Amino acid sequence: MNQEDNTGGGGIFGLFKWTKDALFGTDISPSMKYKDQEERRDRSRYAQDDTNFSMKFGNDSNRRSTNLSRSNSWSGLDSTLHRKYELLPEYNENGFNSIVNGDHHSKERIRSLRSPAPIVPREPLRNEPTDTFGHRLHTKRRTINELSNSQIPFIPPQEDDPLLSKLFNKDGVNEVRRSPYKLSVKDIPGKFPSPLTKRDEIDNYYVRDEDACHKNREYKKAYFDLFAQMDLNSRDLEDLCEDVREQREQFHRNEQTYKQAYEEMRAELVNELKKSKTLFENYYSLGQKYKSLKKVLDQTISHEAELATSRERLYQEVDLKNFEIQTLKQRLSDLELKYTNLQIEKDMQRDNYESEIHDLLLQLSLRNNERKDTSAGSNIFSTGQYDRTPFHNGNDSYDSNSHSWDTDYLKNIDGFIER
């Protein structure tokens, strides 16, 4: 018993002590505790184990028994015990494990999953008797109303709990009920909350018949088998926790690997996005340049078409002008030829006219000379001078000042020449 108290509530001894206290240390038997308690608020009136010692009661809250402050395996219970020793990890609103997100409380809770339950008494530990059941014989019985103010609300077990299913097997209970004699709670070792109004019933405990003792031995054997199974379950649970821890470490390693790969992929994606952005900007700039060049090319093609049209029109005008020039040249050539012919003809006519005039003048001069000769017939030889015609004055050129001529006759001659 001392060895169990010194374990601090951990290991198989703490588990055994917890089970023993849960079975034999309550004011109400386990079968009566859950009987006819369908609602949760009714079940919460009863607390497990001897944690009722530290509950506060109404007006008698200052009244304490000197034998009620002993520490036990469940004296350290508070509202966070189930959260602390919960095997499954909690998840936040995003669905991720809170340990991964850096929850310090969850890390501490997971780290202490396999640690023994601490013994934290609600009052300072005193050097008092460690008898769990004997001190209750002389204490005042507490009522249900006093138990309703418990600081630790009762949490009913699950219906599929294998431990409770084996402890409270309905077949075994029905078998006991069908037996020819009814077993009293006093036939089972330990103290139960049944009212002990008569002391002689306790004194007559050792004189029950042998069948009841045999039943008690069978119950004890079942309890020890159950404890052995619980020991195996504890070992399996430790192995399972070790596997969970290893898997969690492997999960963290994989997560770190994935996170590093994600960071690398993200950095590479950012670089690719930057390159894509630069490429897109260059492509957009090139597209704008292409559009401007295409516009200039279209304008150039339009100008070239207009230039070709203008060139064609100019060529046509040049051809037309060349034709006109050729025509004018031909006409000019014809006119020059005609002018030349006319000039030649005019020169020839002038020469003819001059020749005729010369002949006429010569004839006229001869006639005048003959007339003069006729009028001065007798004295021709007496004059010593021979009158020559205007055309015979030394250089055979006509001298208009040497002799006077008939102007009317000459006018007629000039008019003939002009014609």
Curated annotation (Swiss-Prot):
Annotated Low complexity bias: 64-75
Cystine connections: none
Annotated keywords: Coiled coil, Cytoplasm, Cytoskeleton, Phosphoprotein
InterPro entries assigned: Bbp1_C (IPR029330), Bbp1_N (IPR029328)
Cellular compartments per GO CC: cytoplasm; spindle pole body
Stretches the record annotates as Disordered: 34-76
Residue list for modification Phosphoserine: 29, 73, 115
Record field: compositional bias (Basic and acidic residues): 34-48
Compartments it resides in: Cytoplasm, Cytoskeleton, Microtubule organizing center, Spindle pole body
Coiled coil, from the record: 229-355
Family: Belongs to the BBP1 family.
Subunit description: Homodimer. Interacts with KAR1, MPS2 and SPC29.
Stated role: Component of the spindle pole body (SPB) required for insertion of the nascent SPB into the nuclear envelope and for the proper execution of spindle pole body (SPB) duplication. Connects the central plaque of the SPB with the half-bridge. Required for proper localization of CDC5 at the SPB and for proper M-phase progression.
Full protein name: Spindle pole component BBP1
Organism this protein belongs to: Saccharomyces cerevisiae (strain FostersB)
Organism lineage string: Eukaryota, Fungi, Dikarya, Ascomycota, Saccharomycotina
